[in-house]
Curated annotation (Swiss-Prot):
Expression (tissue specificity): Expressed in head and abdomen of adult females.
Lineage, uppermost ranks: Eukaryota, Metazoa, Ecdysozoa, Arthropoda, Hexapoda
Binding site for glyoxylate: S155, R356
Temperature dependence: Optimum temperature is 60 degrees Celsius. Maximum activity between 50 and 80 degrees Celsius (for alanine and glyoxylate as substrates).
Primary subcellular site in the record, as a coarse category: other
Protein name: Alanine--glyoxylate aminotransferase
Domain of life: Eukaryota
A GO molecular-function annotation: L-serine-pyruvate transaminase activity
Keyword Transferase listed: yes
Protein location: Peroxisome
Function field: Catalyzes the pyridoxal 5'-phosphate-dependent transamination of alanine with glyoxylate as an amino group acceptor. Can also catalyze, although with much less efficiency, the transamination of serine, and histidine with glyoxylate and the and transamination of glycine with pyruvate as an amino group acceptor. Does not catalyze the transamination of both 3-hydroxykynurenine and L-kynurenine. May play a role in the detoxification of glyoxylate, a toxic plant metabolite from the pupae and adult diet.
Length: 393
């Protein structure tokens, strides 16, 4: 029988992967130690060596999250998978969920929750600000939700949401708290148990500096008990916490096959977490906060205006208002074409309004802050020469 579709000519060409400096909102550049780990031989998804690596990762995630939750594991997915899984496991048809909206990820979580049959309510913060505890309390009283969803660090707006006291407040109202820490973990304090957070997830490709595609997640005892009281099965097999948790050895039952996990991604994530543990959370967070302050000073000294309120700024993603008359896309293209430096535009509610500069993982250094400041100022001046940039680094 004749094969009429021929091998594509493009696959006879060599693979090209330029070495770019990723100073956008993620992914960040992976350390060489992570890349080296990922070149190791592939293992089977139930080989004892693979299960040992998974156990190592679980312990590391508990440290990063500051939790002792037994239901701590990883999903074979991007950070969106964490959002899907936390919502999918804790919501049933008709359940009221309150979304704390500080940017695009409030919109995305509301969309997902609607698809799972939830009754979605939204409380919006002021532009560029986080929600206060009083605003959250008032919304809980009005809407009486069974779940509150918050994004600790919204990468679209550069806003850091305060969390201390929110979990206790939720539990006074018989409400569970879900928190997205994809863009914030390692760049801001996080105490999952102390702050009484019930479900939380992060991304592998931000501060941790591993490739995207594997997402740490954790569920509290309260969340597990809520899951056990469900009247219906979790709507998506792939996200079911009991099934994935059994694969990860969380509940004391025999480990079962759930899906074929990427051993390569496990290697990279393990080493990325090991590096974070070696540095330690206090030093890791301080490094990101110090670099962010250096970036803020440099931008403001050059005459740029920051988008987020000073008291609510996220250290890992800085949002800069696009100066009048500047085409943000042309400026970003200039930075990439001239220097192979990634600078991003806005997302969702900030699309066309801001630039976004990310300082994450090994890109959170004084040298890279100074580099991105230099490139950013030159790029803006190049596409709009009459914009006054006060000085160059």
């Amino acid at each position: 029988m004749e094969y009429k579709v021929t091998p594509p000519a493009v696959l006879r060409e060599p693979l090209v992967t330029p070495n770019k400096l990723l100073m956008g909102p993620g992914p960040s550049n992976a350390p060489q130690r992570v890349l080296d780990a990922m070149s190791r031989p592939i293992l089977g998804h139930l080989h004892p060596e693979t299960l040992k690596i998974m156990d190592d990762i679980k312990e590391g995630v508990r440290y990063l999250f500051q939790t002792n939750n037994i239901a701590t594991f990883c999903l074979s997915a991007s950070g969106h998978g964490g959002m899907e899984a936390t919502l999918c496991n804790l919501l049933e048809d008709g359940d009221v969920i309150l979304i704390g909206h500080t940017g695009h990820w409030g919109d995305r979580s509301a969309d997902m929750a609607t698809r799972y049959g939830a009754d979605v309510r939204v409380v919006k913060s002021k532009v560029g600000q986080s929600l206060s505890l009083d605003e959250i309390r008032d919304a809980l009283l009005i809407h009486k939700p069974s779940v509150l969803f918050l994004t600790q660090g919204d990468s679209s707006t550069g806003v850091l949401q305060g969390l201390e006291g929110v979990g206790a407040l939720c539990h006074q109202h018989n409400c569970l708290l879900i928190v997205d820490t994809v863009a914030s973990l390692g760049g801001a304090p996080m105490f999952m148990d102390r702050w009484e957070i019930d479900a939380m997830y992060t991304g592998s490709q931000k501060v941790l500096g591993a490739p995207p595609g594997i997402t740490p997640v954790s569920f509290s005892h309260r969340a597990v008990e809520r899951y056990k009281r469900r009247n219906t099965k979790v709507k998506v097999y792939y996200w079911d916490m009991s099934l994935v948790g059994d694969y990860w050895g969380c509940f004391g039952r025999p480990r079962i096959y759930h899906h074929t996990i990427s051993s390569t991604l496990l290697y990279g994530l393990r080493e990325a977490i090991a590096m974070a543990c070696e540095e330690g959370l206090p030093a890791l967070i301080a490094r990101h906060e110090d670099c962010a302050k250096r970036l803020y000073r440099g931008l403001q000294d050059a005459g740029f205006e920051l988008y987020a309120d000073p008291k609510d700024r996220l250290s890992t993603v800085t949002t800069i208002k696009v100066p009048q008359g500047v085409d943000w896309l042309k400026a970003a293209q200039y930075a990439m074409k001239t220097y192979l430096v990634e600078i991003s535009g806005g997302l969702g509610p900030t699309a066309g309004q801001v630039f976004r500069i990310g300082l994450m993982g090994q890109n959170a250094t004084t040298e890279r802050v100074d580099r991105v400041l230099q490139v950013f100022q030159e790029a803006v001046a190049a596409v709009k020469p009459d914009v006054q940039v006060k000085g160059k680094m």
